[in-house]
Design a protein with these regions (language model features):
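Divalent metal-cofactor coordination and adjacent catalytic microenvironments
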Residues: 1-217
């Protein structure tokens, strides 16, 4: 069931990589700030592309991110659903849950924090959410980015830096020396092998599998 989604408190920094990690991806020595402006922009693009690939929902105002944010969802209940599929996963704090205007306590709900699934319960029984609005406020995402997510973002950053340093249409290059320096370049015709139409290549996307949301109608 689709909800109305709002970011209440956006992440202070939506980037998955620190500037130190971006410097390392660029092969710079620690403390070398000569390319910080370029790398900060790269980090923002990489994080945004990973959020898109992972189908992270946004509110149309703030940049979607896997970093920790406080959000609010309103579900218009039909009186026949026993499970709410929250838009964000990896939930660290469930702040407020109301059903048809009545606030629930912790014992009234059961949360799968990693999957972002919320049930209405009474003891050991699962209940159906009553007709009307169900409002859920919670904090989801990472304060500290997991190492595997950092690794995938670093791989994508290195790929982007490598692509920027060469012409992707060049198939091969040869240099002849004897008289005058002669350079010959062969170009790909048609699609470039290994290229991808999406923002994240398949091998990196595979590393992100546990962070990809499943779209719910």
């Amino acid at each position: 069931m689709r909800s109305t989604f709002t970011v209440v408190t956006p992440a202070a920094d939506p980037s998955l990589l620190t500037i130190e990690q971006l410097r390392a991806a660029a092969g710079l020595v620690p403390g070398d700030a000569s390319r910080d402006a370029e790398l900060t922009e790269l980090g923002a693009r990489v994080s945004a592309d990973i959020a898109t690939a992972c189908q992270i929902r946004g509110d149309g105002v703030h940049v979607p991110t896997l970093r920790s944010e406080e959000v609010r969802e309103v579900f218009r209940q039909r009186g026949c659903d026993d499970l709410l599929f929250l838009a964000r996963r990896f939930i660290s704090d469930l702040t407020l849950v109301t059903e048809a205007g009545t606030a629930l306590v912790a014992d009234d709900t059961d949360l799968d924090a990693e999957a972002g699934l919320l049930q209405r319960i009474s003891g050991t029984r699962t209940l159906t959410w009553p007709r009307g609005d169900a409002v859920v406020e919670y904090t989801a995402g990472f304060e500290t980015v997991p190492p595997d997510l950092v690794g995938a973002a670093m791989d994508l950053a290195r790929l982007r830096l490598s692509a920027a340093a060469r012409d992707p249409l060049v198939k091969g290059e040869s240099v002849e020396i004897p008289d005058v320096r002669t350079v010959r370049q062969d170009y790909w015709v048609g699609a470039v092998p290994g290229s991808t139409a999406g923002p994240v290549p398949a091998d990196i996307l595979a590393k992100l599998s546990q962070y990809i949301n499943v779209a719910v109608a």
